[in-house]
Amino acid sequence: MNGEYKTLANKSFESNVLFFGQEACLPNYTYKGNNVRDSYVIHYIQEGKGTFAAANHPATVLKAGDIFILPKGTPCFYQADNDQPWKYFWIGFSAGIRIEAMLSGSLLAQKCYLRQVQNGHIYADLSELYKVLHIPNSLINDVLLGSLIYRLFYDLLRWYPADATNIKVKSTEQFNLAVSYLQENYSTGCTIMDLCHYLNLSRSYLYTLFKTHANTSPQKLLTKLRLEDAKQRLSTSNNSVQSIANMVGYKDSFTFSKAFKRYSGASPSYYRKSIGI
């Protein structure tokens, strides 16, 4: 077989390319490495044909002009044809939540392949991205690389949108993950920006996510978690206001007391007295 495989040290932008390569396969060649990956690998078939299957998807014959993806954490099988073995190039993307969010809105994520994209935007995007990946790193090339990555996912979303039901399910998963993070970390003093970094989502997208699923904001939920816990501690313990403030994620008692009064209508000390503690 003739081919190349290269890893990419560039870590700029939120959507990272980890590796890329090309292969002209021998007849009936089957990949025998670890077929469950922690990345997303998009293949474009340049010549020939072969058989591709991903878990929970039927096997299908793909040919020149088609693309397929090896999704994160999904067993896949792909084999070159005996008479017309395929040649393809691939680009591997990191498995961050931002990549997953963009992919989830595309038909590629649902089917794991797209047919005959060679005359459209997707091939143009992949081809140009693959070409730029061979250029040595520099600031201007890093900027170009980032723009090409986002253009690729933009065109996947525009020209091959996913079933709306699947998009809604993915959005629900992101929301549930965000809520779980806040529930588990509010006492550590985490911020909404910490949550954004954890999920690799923008603050504006996160806000929309919470308004859609809970008609509230992330900050309001974080405040509620902290202050409901504080109310419980004020009514069941003799810990000082400062100690309770620290226990629920506030660095100082002044900020805590101000937030508590705004939330409950009374200062922590008055609230404690009102319930007889």
From Swiss-Prot:
<feature type="DNA-binding region" description="H-T-H motif">
    <location>
        <begin position="241"/>
        <end position="264"/>
    </location>
</feature>
<dbReference type="InterPro" id="IPR018062">
    <property type="entry name" value="HTH_AraC-typ_CS"/>
</dbReference>
<keyword id="KW-0238">DNA-binding</keyword>
<feature type="DNA-binding region" description="H-T-H motif">
    <location>
        <begin position="193"/>
        <end position="214"/>
    </location>
</feature>
<dbReference type="Pfam" id="PF12833">
    <property type="entry name" value="HTH_18"/>
</dbReference>
<dbReference type="GO" id="GO:0003700">
    <property type="term" value="F:DNA-binding transcription factor activity"/>
</dbReference>
<dbReference type="InterPro" id="IPR020449">
    <property type="entry name" value="Tscrpt_reg_AraC-type_HTH"/>
</dbReference>
<protein>
    <recommendedName>
        <fullName>Raffinose operon transcriptional regulatory protein RafR</fullName>
    </recommendedName>
</protein>
<feature type="domain" description="HTH araC/xylS-type">
    <location>
        <begin position="176"/>
        <end position="274"/>
    </location>
</feature>
<dbReference type="Pfam" id="PF02311">
    <property type="entry name" value="AraC_binding"/>
</dbReference>
<dbReference type="InterPro" id="IPR037923">
    <property type="entry name" value="HTH-like"/>
</dbReference>
<dbReference type="InterPro" id="IPR003313">
    <property type="entry name" value="AraC-bd"/>
</dbReference>
<dbReference type="InterPro" id="IPR018060">
    <property type="entry name" value="HTH_AraC"/>
</dbReference>
<dbReference type="InterPro" id="IPR009057">
    <property type="entry name" value="Homeodomain-like_sf"/>
</dbReference>
<comment type="function">
    <text>Involved in the regulation of the raffinose-operon.</text>
</comment>
<keyword id="KW-0010">Activator</keyword>
<keyword id="KW-0804">Transcription</keyword>
<keyword id="KW-0805">Transcription regulation</keyword>
<dbReference type="GO" id="GO:0043565">
    <property type="term" value="F:sequence-specific DNA binding"/>
</dbReference>
